[in-house]
Amino acid sequence: LHLHYPFAGARMLRDLLRQEGHAIGRRQVATLMRRMGIEALYRKPHLSRRHPAHTIYPYLLRDLTIRRPNHVWAADITYIPMRRGFVYLFAILDWASRRVLAWRLSNTLTTDFCLEAVREAITQYGCPEIFNTDQGCQFTSQEFTGLLKDQGIQISMDGKGCWRDNVFVERLWKSIKYEEVYLHAYETVGAAQQGLARYLMFYNQTRPHQALDGQTPDQVYSDHLTTRRTAA
């Protein structure tokens, strides 16, 4: 049942088991879940905990028309569950093309692995005009905001608790988890790294997007770069 309904907690699993004729209580289900090392898979709290001393920047994307790659990049952190435990995934998404530009996995929720990915994306693709994140302490830190400012990038941050302000990253998380992560019980961080690398290559190069008129993120991103070179 957990593999079919990975979002189900002890109460829901109890009710599902009862539908199948099993007389079992919530506490018994919770005990069995602990013994088996499984838990409901959902976005956990405190990934985006604010730091009271850090500056919060305004949200710049409201009513903004975003049609060209490298206009706006968006980034966030999510949990990637494994058979036992979890790791953190940080990814940078080009808003217009939906292309994943860089990503990193980490065992700890620090700023360092986010900075590595940002530097990689800037080195490979240049700088966006605007970089959007939530108000998590990793993104409001002087190290993170300083890196963006040094590159002349405008900083945009979601409203507090407004996940819809970064909706395309949330859709990316859903695709990653339901099309890759929930189908595999990663035994190690290395296995998670390999699985995500394989999926994100598929996501960028092969997976058609309805919002992109059936094109892939790579096609939209590359077409823009080709058009710019031709115009120049």
Task: Describe the predicted segments one by one.
Residues 1-232:
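Charged DNA-binding/catalytic regions of mobile-element recombinases
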